[in-house]
């Protein structure tokens, strides 16, 4: 006799998962391995996702935290800088060591770097809204001399900070912050420093905003909201917070289906599901399959917008063909993001 499975609605958010910057960064490592052979070194996790990192390691990537960890015998092999960006000192160190490097910094993070440098060029002290210790924050602060940037993490920081010249200030933000929380910090800073200069363009990236909007729209009425992402993924953790604030009874961050605590979930009838910008779609599929094994699942697409952005890879590797098979370890065999457009503009 077939076991009865209770009904379950899964609200599958769209957009979700990989953004254009993450796609580009992973593809840079894949293409470098195809062109130059293993090993390809990567400074820091290329993106904050264990599954992605392990998949690239299996293909010949070696992850290091500092360039000094690269053996002398492999100094002729390429090193890739992560999507989060690096301080100016890192490429300078690579050049001093005669290393060939490929910079996989997200173009939107690079834009924040340029905005910060523009503030300084115009004589402003730079305020960076972000989380201390995050690689993106370290990279942005490292674009300017010591003392040229002040990090603000909370509204309380914004309320208590002081500057020598309060009329010459400019701010930028980490790209992966909560839109709502950042708005509160900016409001407090603007109230205290009326001449505070904003960046020429929004610092929080389109993908962060889009994923938060989709979760916010889907969360009301959800018994549980699952976000696929790593514990060190800033944008994924923000999605958990957004789901809770928007009305989900419970929200969880999981890296794989095996992380779901079924006993803790209890009785549920509506589940929201999304993924951080560094989480692969193949894990979303895995989690849906885990629910299908326990419930009679009906999937409702909770889509708020459609993303079409694509970023070109580095010129040095545009002559290498990227195939569906190359990216199947993160996208699955049925889904490829950006490959057809990636190679345009050679």
Curated annotation (Swiss-Prot):
**Which cofactor does the UniProt annotation name?**
[4Fe-4S] cluster
Residues noted as binding (2E)-4-hydroxy-3-methylbut-2-enyl diphosphate in the record, renumbered to the chain: 48, 84, 134, 175, 233-235, 278
- Provide the GO MF annotations for this entry: 4 iron, 4 sulfur cluster binding; 4-hydroxy-3-methylbut-2-enyl diphosphate reductase activity; metal ion binding
UniProt enzyme class:
oxidoreductase
Q: Which residues bind isopentenyl diphosphate?
A: 48, 84, 134, 233-235, 278
Q: Which residues bind dimethylallyl diphosphate?
A: 48, 84, 134, 233-235, 278
Instruction: Give GO BP annotations, semicolon-separated.
Output: dimethylallyl diphosphate biosynthetic process; isopentenyl diphosphate biosynthetic process, methylerythritol 4-phosphate pathway; terpenoid biosynthetic process
List its EC numbers: 1.17.7.4
Which positions in this protein are listed as binding [4Fe-4S] cluster? 19, 106, 205
Q: Name one Pfam family in it.
A: LYTB
Query: Which Gene3D superfamilies does the UniProt entry name for this protein?
Result: 3.40.50.11270, 4-hydroxy-3-methylbut-2-enyl diphosphate reductase, catalytic domain
- Where does the record place the catalytic residues? 136
Cofactor notes: Binds 1 [4Fe-4S] cluster per subunit.
Keywords assigned by UniProt?
4Fe-4S, Iron, Iron-sulfur, Isoprene biosynthesis, Metal-binding, Oxidoreductase
What is this protein for, i.e. what is its function? Answer: Catalyzes the conversion of 1-hydroxy-2-methyl-2-(E)-butenyl 4-diphosphate (HMBPP) into a mixture of isopentenyl diphosphate (IPP) and dimethylallyl diphosphate (DMAPP). Acts in the terminal step of the DOXP/MEP pathway for isoprenoid precursor biosynthesis.
**What is the similarity comment for this entry?**
Belongs to the IspH family.
| NCBIfam families to which the protein is assigned, alphabetical | ispH_lytB, PRK01045.1-4
Its name, as the record gives it, is: 4-hydroxy-3-methylbut-2-enyl diphosphate reductase
Q: What is the lineage of its organism?
A: Bacteria, Pseudomonadati, Pseudomonadota, Alphaproteobacteria, Hyphomicrobiales
């Amino acid at each position: 006799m077939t076991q009865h499975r209770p009904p379950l609605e899964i609200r599958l958010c769209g957009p979700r998962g990989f953004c254009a910057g993450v796609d580009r960064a992973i593809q840079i490592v894949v293409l470098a391995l195809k062109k130059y052979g293993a090993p390809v070194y990567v400074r820091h996790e290329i993106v904050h996702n264990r599954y992605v990192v392990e998949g690239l390691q299996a293909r010949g990537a070696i992850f290091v935290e500092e360039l000094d960890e690269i053996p002398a015998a492999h100094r002729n092999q390429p090193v890739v800088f992560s999507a989060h960006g690096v301080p100016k000192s890192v490429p300078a160190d690579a050049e001093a060591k005669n290393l060939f490097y490929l910079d996989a910094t997200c173009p939107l993070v690079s834009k924040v770097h340029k905005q910060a440098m523009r503030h300084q060029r115009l004589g402003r002290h730079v305020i960076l809204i972000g989380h201390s210790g995050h690689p993106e924050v370290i990279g942005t602060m490292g674009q300017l001399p010591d003392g040229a940037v002040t990090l603000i993490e909370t509204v309380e920081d914004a309320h208590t900070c002081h500057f020598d010249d309060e009329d010459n200030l400019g701010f930028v933000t980490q790209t992966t912050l909560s839109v709502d929380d950042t708005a509160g910090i900016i409001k407090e800073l603007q109230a205290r420093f009326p001449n505070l200069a904003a960046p020429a363009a929004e610092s929080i990236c389109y993908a962060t905003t889009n994923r938060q909007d989709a979760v916010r729209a889907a969360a009301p009425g959800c018994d549980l909201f699952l976000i696929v992402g790593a514990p060190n993924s800033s944008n994924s953790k923000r999605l958990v917070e957004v789901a809770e604030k928007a009305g989900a009874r419970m929200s969880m961050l999981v890296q794989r289906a095996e992380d779901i605590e079924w006993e803790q979930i209890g009785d549920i009838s509506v589940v929201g599901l999304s993924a951080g910008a560094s989480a692969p779609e193949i894990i979303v599929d895995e989690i849906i399959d885990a629910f299908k094994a326990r419930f009679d699942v009906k999937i409702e697409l909770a889509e708020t917008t459609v993303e079409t952005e694509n970023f070109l890879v580095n010129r040095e590797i545009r002559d290498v063909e990227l195939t569906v098979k190359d990216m199947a370890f993160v996208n699955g065999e049925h889904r490829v993001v950006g490959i057809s457009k990636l190679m345009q503009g050679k």
